[in-house]
């Protein structure tokens, strides 16, 4: 299965396409988006997007009513319908994160008196 993100300003965000066809946003949520981001090699997700946020999509959809647990390694492992009732303004999308969810990066800056911790 080939997953791509289309229409976003960079490689970590866009409308989700599976084998060249869009995914419908009916029931689309953060768990679904997490599976997509993980499948694309990103460690986490910032947001699941709806309503073709990254541009209108073709009206022939690959998946509808996607329902993931967040533990799947592939979007195709998630429950979904193949028959859709979606329009070009119902593309599902993601904004993937380059950092693990909940992790803060800590930087210690050494000064003359004492270190400064920057989060």
Language model region names:
Residues 1-119:
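Intrinsic disorder and flexible/low-complexity segments
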């Amino acid at each position: 299965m080939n997953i791509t993100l289309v229409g976003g300003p960079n490689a970590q965000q866009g409308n989700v396409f599976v084998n060249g066809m869009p995914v419908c946003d009916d029931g689309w949520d953060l768990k679904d988006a997490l599976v997509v981001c993980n499948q694309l090699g990103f460690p986490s997700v910032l947001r699941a997007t709806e309503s073709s946020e990254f541009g209108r999509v073709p009206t022939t959809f690959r998946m509808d009513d996607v329902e993931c647990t967040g533990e799947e390694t592939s979007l195709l492992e998630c429950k979904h319908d193949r028959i859709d009732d979606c329009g070009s303004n119902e593309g599902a999308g993601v904004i993937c994160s380059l950092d693990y969810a909940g992790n803060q990066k800590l930087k210690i800056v050494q000064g003359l008196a004492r270190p400064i911790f920057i989060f």
